[in-house]
Amino acid sequence: MNQLIKTFTALAVLLTLYPQAWAQPKITWDSKSLLVDGRRVVPVMGEIHYSRLPEDEWESAVKNMKAGGVTMIATYVFWNHVEEQEDLWDWSGSRNLRHFLEICKQEQMPVVLRLGPFCHGEVRNGGIPDWFFTKGIKSRSEDPRFLTLAEKLYRQIFTQVQGLQWKDGGPVVACQFDNEYRGKGSYLMALKQMAQRIGFDLPFYTRTGWPELATPVPFGEILPLYGDYADGFWERSIAPTAGNYYKAFFFQPNRVNDNIATEQIKYDSVSSSSAGKGRGGASYPYFTCELGGGMMTSYHRRVYMYPNDAYAMAVVKLGSGSNLLGYYMYHGGTNPEGKCAYLNETQRTMATNYNDLPVKTYDFQAPLGEFGQANSVFFRLRPLHRFMHDFQETLAPMVAHFPNTAQARKGDDSYLRWSYRSDGRSAFVFFNNYERLQHLTAKKGVQFHVGDVTFPSRPMVIPADAIGIFPVGVAGIRYATAQLVGKEGGKVYLMQVKGVPVEIAFEDGKVIRNGKPRGTGKPIYKLYYLLTIEEAEQMGKTVKPFSHTVMEKVPFERKREAGPLRTITIGVNKVAEEPTDADFNQAAVYTISLPDSLSPDALLDINYHGDCARLYANGKLIDDNFYNGRHFQYGLWRLPKNTQKLELRILPMQKDEPVYFPQEADTTPGEGINSIKILSR
């Protein structure tokens, strides 16, 4: 199969157009898309935080992202990761940005650097060092004292980037200034001018398109990128469906949603009046940088994500006109050890004290987890990413149309949600019958009307939770109720959307009804192949999940019962506070005995229940977990050699905690270990 189906490549159109590899074409943009030497591309951007991964895992992480269909990487440069102590810069080890960029160059993976100075990313103070707050300077302002410090940061970053910009043959194609900024556009312009003065010279520059700026930046100077999430750990509510996240599952022309950063941004109204617009009616392309590839668990809100959460949202954004899907996060990580303090966001920190996040883990339930685990959503997204690459020149110029203009309402089950994108000759129909934590029923009597084409020939049923994209007038297909996946060497690959009957009408007059998948070995007609979703998810070079059990029962022993239950206090931002180090001194303590030898990819899998847990090696905290029903996992390859014992501390679940737990969590008061295994790929 690997000979039949090409492997995903980084910003793959570059390699298609320039097989000598990594020749630097000209990258531009217009109101529709990015262009590479004039040819339209529809990238998949995946966020990974290089400083949240050990340096020796970067290469495999980038390769695995590429295998998932990611064609561009985004990463924050956290100020307090590299200057935690004033004037003591640390670009070593996991903070070695230059080495990370060199790996991206080696792997032909373009990079967007999110420079800050403010980043957020659930990092302590949003990435701004503690020492800054002793100076009495207003952050994120045009105060010359702040800009002087920002310039020092940018100059330091440039020492890492120099010679690795796109114009140099390097991977850095763009940078983002600040993050979720709502003040005057002149501040962002000051950062851009500063960066260019230092030496940054990139094909394009970006900002987050939310919230609305108090005053705009001149059109064309900085591209706004948007985002959306299926749920948010930052919501104050402990109800299952807090906020307006249902809007992420409706096709709509509005690029700005009021779901992001609601703990810090008060949205008076959400309007698309200025979103993507410039002087004289010119407009920006619809790009995203923060589509929730997963979601973190905060202490007060233990969100549990499902594969269709990210998949449905991605299809909806693509069907709403987006020509760059940027996931936050695509690869999870672990907070590095701080020199002065923990580096996670908490309600006790001086800034970004909105939520309590785990001290160490930043797994994010992402497609690739904290230790590179290929989660179900990784495979769910792969066929979509292949489609975006192989049909990008057809898709990119297409305009989005919205047949149903009803206002989005939570759980609205009265109609099938759909849109189509068309250039007047060809089209793609996008539909979504899924909404997170809502039951949408099967939709009967469905036919789509696009131009002069009505299909299928007879009304059909779209099952509950079905999500898909149907071609009209593309690749020799007049219409199909199957989803295009890819094309290669004259062959065209489609997949059946689960539960949807397949009807394919070809331009030559041939019609196939009730088509059945035959895999990649046997065409359904001429050079057309019909696959199952599972076959499409495994096409080409992929990443093996941790599915092999190396050790069924890892020995463990309870060394100490839990002490008195802690009092769960409400913090400054009106949500429950996470346990302190002192609280964990009262936790139940278990000793885990490891085997004498371990495979290089041994993953510890702890099935426990309780409020939260911490894992220690030789007395040092190495990872932690806010319980939400998923297993607590740890990559044993990160341990010092000859580590024989680990210590697990679990705080008991309490009755009626002021915390949202999903239905997958065991909320029985108390704590315990169900099993501990060692897995491998």
Language model segments and positions:
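Bacterial Sec-dependent N-terminal signal peptides
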Residues: 1-24
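Active-site region of glycoside hydrolase catalytic domains
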Residues: 106-112, 119-267, 272-297, 319-322
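Carbohydrate-binding surfaces of carbohydrate-active enzymes
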Residues: 135, 146-160, 168-176, 182-192, ...
